[in-house]
Amino acid sequence: MKKRCIYQFLLVCISSCFLACNGYLEEIPQNKQKLTSTDDYEQLLNKAYLTEAVLPYIDLLTDDISYIVADRDPRFGNVADSYLGAYMWDNNIESTMPNGDEVFGKFYNSIYYTNVVIDEVDQAVGISSNKEETERIRGYLKGEAYALRAFRYLYLVNMYAPPYDPATSSTTPGIPINLETSADDKPYTREMLDKVYEQIVDDLKKAIPLMEENYVNVKKNRFSPIAAKALLARVYLICKNGI
């Protein structure tokens, strides 16, 4: 009888352990924050903007920057020389950079954040009791995420793919397109150039009405409906009305 009671006690303990383990596995990992409110998604979108830190290096590829070695400020040492390859349009500009070419990785990280906002913000809880205001904020954030994603892809395709030519765009490799939020480690193939630009245009066409119909006054460093329209016009100019 005593042994039977012990067995029953052990069985209860083991069952409790399994139940506890199941509950533990259902918990959100400590290194992953669960987004619930519109404010949470706005903060994530702000993080997607932070990759602007790599844009000064991109400016070196344009005519906006001049670099005169004789006038170099000695206080900065040879820091500017690290990016001289970009300024000179060397074939291997990453070789002199202290951290290599960061644009590709940082911009795809930014795209991942915009994907999360686009997929999930419709279920976000408002920080106020005003339902109409919550709906408006959701809509604007979603539109803003579409615009920012298009902006990132436009930069990437212009940096890592040949120029757009309507005659050859359907057979010219462009860049990978990722519209998912899963963290699966899988290879991505390069889409053809016309598909990349079609995705950019599609994102902007979704972004503009969402931001116009749900207008929210945001800081100047974030996308507005006018900025999205200007970006769409630029895309059409690049494509020479071939898309």
Task: For the regions a language model picked out, list residue spans one by one.
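Membrane-proximal, proline-rich intrinsically disordered regions
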Residues: 21-70
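Short coil/turn linking the two alpha-helices of tandem helical-hairpin repeats
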Residues: 157-164, 215, 238-242
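Bacterial Sec-dependent N-terminal signal peptides
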Residues: 1-31
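Conserved, well-structured interaction surfaces
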Residues: 83-160, 191, 209-212
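Aromatic-residue-lined binding/catalytic grooves and analogous aromatic/hydrophobic interfacial grooves
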Residues: 21-22, 226, 231, 235-243
